Every structure is written in structure tokens, then in C-alpha cells.
């Protein structure tokens, strides 16, 4: 029996949350703070407004993000798990960089599906000072992300771009002269609206809050359709990303995606083999009851990846 993965060692969210520090950073959190059955301060994670205010406090206290908000009905992400993905990406880049995590604006990351919350660019820039380009098909999400970027004066660190061809992921998005050290993606994992609704209801029930007459809040469990589901579900989305990545093989060092369902891995690995990748990594991730993994692939062999890092250093 293997141990379940825990938070990455560099993750800032080890142990219990420091509620006094969070309330000091964002006093509005105090009105949502409750005492849990173990006598510890917490919030009602079934209350969307509480989750949003909690995230705002966490981003301010831990990451220096002074202004953060999202529109109603958009995903309110659990920050520790999102931070883990960033740290795993950093380890991936360190692998071919003599074990050193590359930092600074010379490192460029592409966040596919940046969302209204803009969470990955905020965390990645705060922890490693990387530059990000965030893409999305949703104009409302992009407007929200832009407001966050501008309010925090991060325009030089975080760019945003609309994918105007919603049936494509990379095609039509990237310019021929752009280079990215890594791409990241947290894909929609349901195959239909009905499946997504059932998933939200399961989470709601697990909190003991299910009420058939009550509309389910969507801030922390749901999101917009394109955030939650796509035709064919997670495996189709990631397989399409693999297929499209072939065209951009020379422009990106590592392509990556989260995969929530382990049963999808064989199909994704088959797509990667067909694409002719030179390197493949699967890294298990998890916190609490939620388990996931990052799949990463590159069309560059070991020597080419090391040369990529050397070129970036020479241009710094």
C-alpha cells in the first residue's frame, strides 16, 4: 500500500490555516469565521460568499494579491491544490536545469483556460516571478481576469488572450515567434451538463447540506459550462490537446495537463505514443480526499531540453 500524496514541500499551506493572520490581512473574513466540531476556527465551505472572502484573505496574506474577486457563478478555486500544480511544474523545469528551479520573467508559462479567477498566473508569479499568458474562450472570464491583473499592477507579468476558435485549444492562439517553457491546464472533466450537476450534488451531499428544493451554489462547487464539462469529457479534451501540441512542438518545452480520473490515463498515454513524444512524466498529486495527477510531455530529448534552459539563461 502506498501513501497518498500530500502537499508539495514548498506549498505555503501546510497544516492548519492561520485565521488570526488571515483576518488581519482581510478583516471581512471575521464575519464568516466559525468554530468547527474540533474547536478550531474555520468557515462554512458550503457558503459561496464565505469561500470567496476566504480566498481573498488567503491571496492577500500569503501571496501579496491585494485585489481579487470573481463574478457570480464562476469557479472559486481551492488555492492549496492550485499552488501544488505550480510547484510540480517548477520541479519539472528544474529537472533539466541542474536541479535548480528557474525563476524570473525569462520563464514563460501558458495557462490554457485561465478562468475568471486567474489563479495559476497569480500563484506562479508570486512564487517564482514567471511571466504568464492566460487564454480562454469566455469573454466574461477574461474581463474578470483582466480586472484582477490591472488592479494588482501585474500587466507586465500576466497577459491575456481570447481563443476565438472554441473548437480548438492551441490552434489559432499562439504566434509563430512565441516560446513557452511550460503550458498548464486544468481541463473540464465532465462529459455533459448532467454529469457536472451530479458531481456538484455529490459534493453538496458530502457536506451534509443537500436540499432538493434549494438551488445549488456554484461559486465553490460549480462554474460555467466550459469550466465544468465538454463533449467527450476530460479524456477527449486532453487527447485533443496532445494532438494539437504536435504542431507547436518546437515552441514549447513541456506541455502539461491535470488529469482527475486515473482511468483516463491509458487512453491519454496511447495518444502521446501516437504523437511521438520524446519524454513523458506522470506525477501523482493530492490533498485530503482529492487525488489527481499531472501528465507532462515534451517533443525535446534530454539534450535539447538542457540546451533550451542554457539558451534562456544566456538571454537573461
UniProtKB/Swiss-Prot annotation:
Belongs to the methyltransferase superfamily. METTL16/RlmF family. One of its GO terms (molecular function) is 23S rRNA (adenine(1618)-N(6))-methyltransferase activity. One of its GO terms (cellular component) is cytoplasm. This is Ribosomal RNA large subunit methyltransferase F. It is an enzyme of class 2 (transferase). HAMAP family: 23SrRNA_methyltr_F. Keywords: Cytoplasm, Methyltransferase, rRNA processing, S-adenosyl-L-methionine, Transferase. It is found in: Cytoplasm. Specifically methylates the adenine in position 1618 of 23S rRNA. One of its GO terms (biological process) is rRNA base methylation. InterPro entries: METTL16/RlmF (IPR010286), rRNA_lsu_MeTfrase_F (IPR016909), SAM-dependent_MTases_sf (IPR029063). The keyword Transmembrane does not apply. The keyword Oxidoreductase does not apply. Coiled coil: none annotated. Its EC number is 2.1.1.181. It catalyses: adenosine(1618) in 23S rRNA + S-adenosyl-L-methionine = N(6)-methyladenosine(1618) in 23S rRNA + S-adenosyl-L-homocysteine + H(+). It comes from Pseudomonas entomophila (strain L48).
Amino acid at each position: 500500500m502506498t501513501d497518498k500524496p500530500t502537499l508539495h514541500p514548498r506549498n505555503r499551506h501546510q497544516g492548519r490555516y492561520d485565521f488570526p493572520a488571515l483576518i488581519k490581512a482581510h478583516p471581512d473574513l471575521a464575519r464568516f469565521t466559525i468554530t468547527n466540531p474540533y474547536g478550531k476556527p474555520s468557515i462554512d465551505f458550503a457558503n459561496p460568499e464565505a469561500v470567496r472572502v476566504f480566498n481573498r484573505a488567503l491571496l492577500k496574506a500569503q501571496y501579496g494579491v491585494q485585489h481579487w474577486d470573481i463574478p457570480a457563478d464562476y469557479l472559486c478555486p481551492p488555492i492549496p491544490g492550485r499552488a501544488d500544480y505550480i510547484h510540480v511544474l517548477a520541479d519539472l523545469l528544474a529537472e533539466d536545469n541542474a536541479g535548480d528551479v528557474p525563476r524570473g520573467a525569462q520563464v514563460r508559462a501558458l495557462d490554457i483556460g485561465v478562468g475568471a479567477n486567474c489563479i495559476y498566473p497569480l500563484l506562479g508569479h508570486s512564487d517564482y516571478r514567471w511571466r504568464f499568458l492566460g487564454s480562454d474562450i469566455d469573454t466574461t472570464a477574461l474581463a474578470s481576469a483582466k480586472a484582477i491583473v490591472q488592479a494588482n499592477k501585474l500587466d507586465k507579468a500576466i497577459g491575456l488572450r481570447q481563443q476565438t476558435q472554441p473548437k480548438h485549444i492551441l490552434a489559432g492562439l499562439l504566434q509563430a515567434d512565441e516560446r513557452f517553457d511550460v503550458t498548464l491546464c486544468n481541463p473540464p472533466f465532465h462529459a455533459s451538463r448532467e454529469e457536472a450537476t451530479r458531481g456538484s450534488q455529490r459534493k453538496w451531499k458530502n457536506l451534509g447540506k443537500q436540499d432538493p428544493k434549494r438551488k445549488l451554489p456554484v461559486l465553490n462547487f460549480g462554474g460555467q459550462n466550459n469550466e465544468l464539462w465538454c463533449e467527450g469529457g476530460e479524456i477527449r479534451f486532453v487527447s485533443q490537446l496532445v494532438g494539437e501540441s504536435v504542431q507547436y512542438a518546437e515552441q514549447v518545452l513541456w506541455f502539461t495537463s491535470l488529469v482527475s480520473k486515473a482511468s483516463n490515463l491509458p487512453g491519454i498515454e496511447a495518444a502521446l505514443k501516437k504523437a511521438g513524444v520524446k519524454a513523458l512524466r506522470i506525477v501523482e498529486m493530492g490533498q485530503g480526499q482529492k487525488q489527481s495527477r499531472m501528465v507532462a510531455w515534451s517533443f525535446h530529448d534530454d539534450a535539447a531540453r538542457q540546451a533550451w534552459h542554457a539558451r534562456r539563461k544566456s538571454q537573461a
